[in-house]
């Protein structure tokens, strides 16, 4: 779920940005009156840039994205922000773990080095996703080995400055619906 000042605009932007390819996951926008307060979101989305990633970045900029500098330095991806300032990355060809040429390919959760294994265990139990990679950069979970979208957790962890604008939502039939905190204090939602 993504907090949005203008739900219709954000829904349209992300539908176009992902080309409707979200690996079966739903991006849900929740109305809010509060603009983004944190310097950097603790959760962000990664899109595949495809073989012509420069053209994909240009396309996203024409949709309303802007370039963003979060101190990333020289990295093999481009950091952009959606129309409400939420950062997302456009991964270049050959990026490890990318199983699609376009659309949403990762949900990235900032966690500290010390918390990543606890977070892996936590999200495996909450979402029933499975670890497929574990490296010094973090861990990657998928619903199934061929799922195009992964949950990537790793450092550096952005400081918790405010309520997260982007939050994970899971469906659990055996748990009371509501908002909860994960092992690092990130809000997430449970639906029945």
Task: Please provide the spans of the model-predicted regions.
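Structured alpha/beta or helical-core interaction and ligand-binding surfaces enriched in interleaved
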Residues: 20, 117, 133
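Terminal peptide-recognition signature
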Residues: 14, 45, 123, 168
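Vicinal oxygen chelate
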Residues: 16, 24-30, 61-111, 125, ...
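Short, solvent-exposed beta-strand edge segments and adjacent coil->beta transition regions
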Residues: 40-44, 102-106, 163-167
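Hydrophobic, helix-prone linear segments
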Residues: 1-24, 30-39
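Short hydrophobic/aromatic beta-strand micro-patches
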Residues: 3, 46-50, 110, 169-173
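Short, conserved charged micro-motifs
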Residues: 8-12, 52-57, 115-118, 174-176
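Short acidic/Ser/Thr-enriched loop-to-helix initiation segments
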Residues: 118-126
């Amino acid at each position: 779920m993504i907090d949005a000042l203008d739900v219709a605009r954000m829904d349209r932007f992300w539908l176009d940005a992902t080309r409707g390819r979200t690996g079966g996951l739903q991006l849900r926008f929740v109305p809010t009156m509060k603009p983004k307060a944190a310097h950097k979101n603790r959760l962000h989305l990664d899109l595949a840039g495809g073989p012509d990633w420069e053209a994909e970045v240009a396309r996203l900029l024409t949709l309303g994205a802007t370039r963003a500098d979060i101190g990333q330095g020289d990295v093999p991806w481009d950091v952009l922000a959606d129309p409400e300032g939420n950062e997302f990355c456009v991964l270049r060809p050959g990026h490890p773990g990318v199983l699609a040429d376009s659309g949403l390919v990762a949900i990235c959760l900032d966690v500290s080095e010390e918390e990543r294994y606890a977070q892996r265990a936590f999200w495996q139990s909450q979402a029933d996703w499975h670890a497929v990679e574990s490296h010094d950069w973090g861990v990657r979970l998928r619903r199934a080995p061929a799922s195009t979208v992964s949950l990537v957790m790793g450092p550096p962890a952005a400081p918790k400055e405010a309520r997260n604008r982007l939050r994970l939502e899971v469906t659990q039939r055996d748990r009371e619906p509501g908002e909860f905190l994960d092992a690092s204090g990130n809000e997430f939602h449970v639906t029945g």
